[in-house]
């Protein structure tokens, strides 16, 4: 019977060692500094229990599933977080929990030595001290606004620029690069009806925007090789800094782009200097196409009948130079950017690869403006602008134009005053 007496001592000792190991493990996870002190205290208590026999210290252990065990005077949950005694808030570190408890107790230990300001959070005091020093480390990337608090900067972005930061893990852009993209898109709103096409002869160049490099993996329909081939012909790549040179990204803006080009052409009654020189006014039909319809449009434009005289096809231009390029009509000279047959008695050049013959009706033609459209939607929008009785009368405001150039300039200005 006397040999069974040490069993309670062994049980208490083993249980205390278990509590010591668990406490030390939890303190390492939470980053608490006082874990070593409690481990030493529990080990000392275990030694005293061995010396005093059955008079071991009482260990308070809570078996409630919602509360966990008591550590550092705070209840700890089973996932290792410290729990607030006033509410259900839980934190991994004691510093955060102490700051939270000050909300309940009303304690404000962080005081300003220049004014009566006091706060329960040290970071709030640091932001307050910037009001005395005048320091404004936070700057808006879209304008010259600066402030001393990050929350004021976020409020400024939402109120002034109507921008909300993108949340989630879908975007792989950094914050500075994302705000740079938003800045470019904001400038597009003010100049959306301006043209990007450069009218300097002999080629028309469309530069590639910088932000397309970041979103190419999300928009597979955009063919970046065409932009890159055109960007090589320009002195500088990327989006131009001039806000007047912006990308045309929808059918309405493409119509405005065409009208802006026609408005800059010389008058219709201008005579050419020589029979071999054709004025740029005869380069009137323009191809309005989208990147997804490039293959169909190029095949159709190459198969259109131009003249009854024998002609030889010119070499096919690079794929990237066909965007927004003039397409020769039934009575116009072939352009440098198309693969249409050449007029006159010219020597045969290197033949282009044979293209599949497509139905010419796929290319929509406006007989009033002598323009060709590869997109049915764009063609419908354009034809809806013509009047029923007078084709050069605006169908929106009723303004009567002289000719197709005046009609195109009227829609480029966008001033539809009801008469």
From Swiss-Prot:
It is found in: Nucleus. InterPro entries: Ikaros_C2H2-ZF, Znf_C2H2_sf, Znf_C2H2_type. It comes from the Eukaryota. There is a cross-link at residues 5, 185 (Glycyl lysine isopeptide (Lys-Gly) (interchain with G-Cter in SUMO2)). The keyword Cell inner membrane does not apply. A zinc finger (C2H2-type) spans 82-104, 110-132, 138-161, 364-386, 392-416. Gene3D superfamilies: Classic Zinc Finger (3.30.160.60). SMART domains: ZnF_C2H2. Residues 289-311 have a biased composition (Low complexity). Keywords: DNA-binding, Isopeptide bond, Metal-binding, Nucleus, Repeat, Repressor, Transcription, Transcription regulation, Ubl conjugation, Zinc, Zinc-finger. Disulfide bonds: none annotated. The keyword Transcription applies. Residues 223-236, 332-349 have a biased composition (Polar residues). GO terms for biological process: regulation of transcription by RNA polymerase II. GO terms for molecular function: chromatin binding; DNA-binding transcription factor activity; RNA polymerase II cis-regulatory region sequence-specific DNA binding; zinc ion binding. Transcriptional repressor that binds the core 5'GNNTGTNG-3' DNA consensus sequence. Involved in megakaryocyte differentiation. PANTHER family: ZINC FINGER PROTEIN (PTHR24404), ZINC FINGER PROTEIN PEGASUS (PTHR24404:SF55). The N-terminal zinc fingers are involved in sequence-specific DNA binding and heterotypic associations with other family members. Self-associates. Interacts with other family members; IKZF1, IKZF2, IKZF3 and IKZF4. 'Pegasus' was the winged horse in Greek mythology. This is Zinc finger protein Pegasus. It comes from Bos taurus.
